Regions:
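Conserved SAM/SAH-binding loop
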Residues: 95
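A short acidic, Gly/Pro-enriched loop at the edge of an enzyme's catalytic core
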Residues: 164-179
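N-terminal auxiliary segments of SAM/dcSAM-dependent transferases
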Residues: 2-47
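Substrate-binding/catalytic lobe of Class I Rossmann-like enzymes that use SAM or dcSAM, i.e.
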Residues: 221-316, 322-325
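Acidic carboxylate diad motif detector
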Residues: 210-212
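Class I SAM-dependent methyltransferase SAM/SAH-binding core
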Residues: 87-89, 98-164
């Protein structure tokens, strides 16, 4: 039985209400819409969530949103055993918050990739500002390979469709110690290809740290239509997978399960309660309206996310994998 949850409609959300649950026309068209969405909305993401565009993981009720977001990174580090001074490929890096954290805190050499031109621009700007402050300089410039020194590590950002990462990094010969992907794989039309490419770019013994959104197993048609389809529509997602679906695809791609899946839905759901309260700003809804249906559907899908968590139909989990052959 579906749990009762306040839909929390407001005068703003009612004013801009739009039906959700439409299917996507083609996967290429969906990818184009995803790129456009992040190019247009990333400045708003920064204002809403800060530099970490992902869920928070609350270990206790007193923690702030920002502390909870760092908690999620630390949880992924624990289950994946990604160590200090690792070479990391951060797939779907957003505006670079995790990449900078891994570089400055663990001394990692991090390459962040995103399909969004705007996100690369913002990530570079934030990284240079942090590096200049860290080095007590007015300005810093990247090295010949595009890396900016940050703490004990360094980081760079590349605009790249993640489905092409296997070929793009082929010349490196599987040189990454870790691949990191947080809340990005759910956007990918070809998830099997991601795991195959991860196998290609990892060195033997390399780790994959993964956090993502999932649909629950064995959903009724009613639950799927009420809870999952609106999320797929508003969040620009191809058909969602189950947690076991990712495990199966990873194994088919040559990876071994290291830890998980660990369902942390109850510990992250608060993210959307906070977010719903943050978006009650007329200018944000007006901006979304100016972007057409996708902009409004995105904001309206926040309610579906909250409902899905409450009903147990929508889940959040972390998983880690390993490429066989390490010492």
């Amino acid at each position: 039985m579906a749990a009762a949850i306040d839909s929390s409609t407001t005068p703003l959300s009612q004013q801009y209400d739009t039906p959700l649950g439409l299917g996507h026309s083609t996967m290429q068209a969906l990818k184009d819409r995803i790129k456009l969405h992040y190019d247009l909305a990333s400045d708003y993401y920064l204002s809403l969530w800060g530099e970490h565009i992902h869920h928070g993981y609350w270990e206790n009720d007193s923690q702030t949103k920002e502390e909870a977001q760092v908690n999620l990174i630390q949880l992924l580090l624990r289950i994946s055993k990604v160590g200090e001074n690792s070479t990391v490929l951060d797939v779907g890096c957003g505006i670079g918050g995790t990449s900078r954290y891994l570089a400055s805190t663990l001394g990692c050499t991090v390459t962040g990739i995103t399909i969004s031109t705007k996100q690369v621009e913002i990530a570079n700007r934030l990284t240079k500002a942090e590096a200049a402050k860290d080095q007590e300089k007015n300005e810093v410039e990247p090295d010949a390979d595009g890396f900016v020194k940050l703490g004990r590590g360094k980081v760079r950002f590349i605009e790249l469709d993640a489905e092409k990462m296997g070929d793009f990094f082929a010349g490196l010969g599987g040189s990454f110690d870790a691949v990191w992907i947080s809340e990005a794989l759910s956007h990918f039309p070809n998830k099997a290809l991601f795991f195959e490419n991860t196998f290609k770019v990892l060195r033997p013994g390399g780790k994959l740290a993964l956090a993502d959104w999932f649909k629950a197993e064995n959903l009724s048609e009613t639950d799927f239509n009420n809870d999952i389809k609106p999320i797929e529509d508003g969040m620009l997602l191809p058909p969602m997978c189950t947690q076991q679906g990712y495990v199966d695809l990873a194994k088919q791609g040559g990876l071994s399960l290291l830890d998980g899946p660990k369902d942390i839905s109850k510990d992250v759901a608060r993210t959307w309660d906070i977010t719903w309260s943050l978006i009650q700003n007329p200018s944000l809804w007006a901006f979304a309206f100016s972007q057409g249906r996708d902009g409004i559907a995105f904001l309206q899908s926040f309610r579906a996310m909250r409902r899905g968590y409450a009903n147990g139909t929508f889940q959040y989990a972390v998983i880690s994998f390993e490429k066989p052959g390490g010492n």
